[in-house]
Amino acid sequence: MPKNPLKILVDEMDDGMDEKLRSIGYDAFSVKKLRADGLKLHTDFSVINYAMENKMILVTRDTENGQACEENNIPCILLDSEEIFKIVLGKLKDYN
């Protein structure tokens, strides 16, 4: 468990990851759940801005969000097709 939990914002495509991260000690939130609680997080801009204002790391599959974070020095973990491909390759090694 991290000493100073990082604040993490999980984009809606990976709703549920926030719960898994919280279970191991991270301070994680889901865009989908925050929206259900009444926060106005309906656009990419508002999601990125929320992460920035709350000093959170954004976890997303949205390439444009990843690029926007990179351009504006906002911490982001982009789960794009290239990252997923690397995971698949790693798992395929188990079958060789």
What annotation goes with each model-predicted range?
Residues 8-12, 57-60:
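Short, hydrophobic beta-strand segments that form beta-sheet elements in well-ordered domains
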Residues 51-70:
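Acidic, metal-binding active-site segment of PIN/NYN-like and related structure-specific nucleases
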Residues 2-3, 9-24, 29-33, 37-39, ...:
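Acidic, PIN/NYN-like endoribonuclease modules and their adjacent C-terminal/linker elements
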